[in-house]
Amino acid sequence: VSQSPFFATDIGAPEGPVALPDGSLYVTEMSAGTLRVTHLTPDGRRRVVLRTGGRPNGLAIDGDGMIWIAEAGLRALIRIAPDGRELMRIEGDGSERFCFPNDLAFGPDGHLYMTDSGLALDDFLDGQDFAEGFMDFDWDGRVYEIDPKAGKVLRTIDRGIRFTNGIAFDAQNRLYANASFPGDVYRYDVFGSSAPSREFFGNVLQPDKRSGFKGPDGMKFGLDGRLYCTVYGQSNVTVLASDGSVADRLMLQGDAPTNCAFARDGQTLLVTEVGVGRVEKLSVPCGGLPLHYPKVG
């Protein structure tokens, strides 16, 4: 029996994959008719966890098995139980609202780190499409550190980024976030400094003749120390070596990958793709660097 290259198909613009120990997967669905968090099993079953009503983007789970949603449409970070009950909602840092919560990564300190792309959806979308000239708008993308127990923003690590998107920690506990428009990945020494500087790490864009938007999206570290970054509009996962250089480009069947998660049981990267609406399985040379799952209570 040949293995299908797809974990799931016919999903409404999937994002935010979170691999669970039993082989199943949480994803968000961002298409206009879905707007929900969905649980997918390898044998094809699916369960709607919650219709959020906004536009859910990135996801993370904590050590209690609760789900954190970066809700771009509602401009909120929301914690829910697996049955869909809302447990907490954070809408800003006390002085200003979030604009576009995008993606999430728990740190080794038990705090939750979140990217905010830097403009509200209504300010750069024209219907379902990007408004004309959107890349030149006044983007104020941010990286936040959040105390999940208290439900409050502790610090803004960076801002003024042109569409902050993917976020991940490496094995040395350094934080990485990417900027979709320039294609850059930045690194922050969040535990070595109270005001860490933005350090250029690498760039994932490749020169090609394609028109249309291309840019880095969700990303994860492998046990090989390399960063696996989905590149929307580029049909690949671009792999950056530990020095930030491009080590590989893993081609996908779909043009528009949005995010990825390593399966818990081995050398498979699960990639969400919004062009066709499916989760693609990619063979990779290693497992994923274990994520942090702090108990929040």
Predicted regions and their residues:
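Glycine/small-residue-rich hydrophobic helix-like segments
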Residues: 186-258
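Beta-rich, blade/repeat-based domains predominating
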Residues: 9-22, 52-71, 94-112, 137-142, ...
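Blade-level signature of beta-propeller repeat domains, shared across WD40, Kelch, NHL, RCC1
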Residues: 259-297
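Short, solvent-exposed loop/turn segments at conserved positions within beta-propeller repeat blades
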Residues: 30-34, 72-73, 121-140, 180-181, ...
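Short loop/turn segments that connect beta-strands within beta-propeller blades
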Residues: 40-44, 81-85, 147-150, 189-193, ...
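A short loop-to-beta-strand structural motif that recurs across blades of beta-propeller domains
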Residues: 36-38, 76-78, 141-144, 184-186, ...
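A short beta-strand motif characteristic of beta-propeller blades
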Residues: 2-8, 44-50, 85-94, 152-158, ...
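Asp-box/WD-like beta-propeller blade repeats and closely related beta-sheet repeat scaffolds
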Residues: 77-132, 140
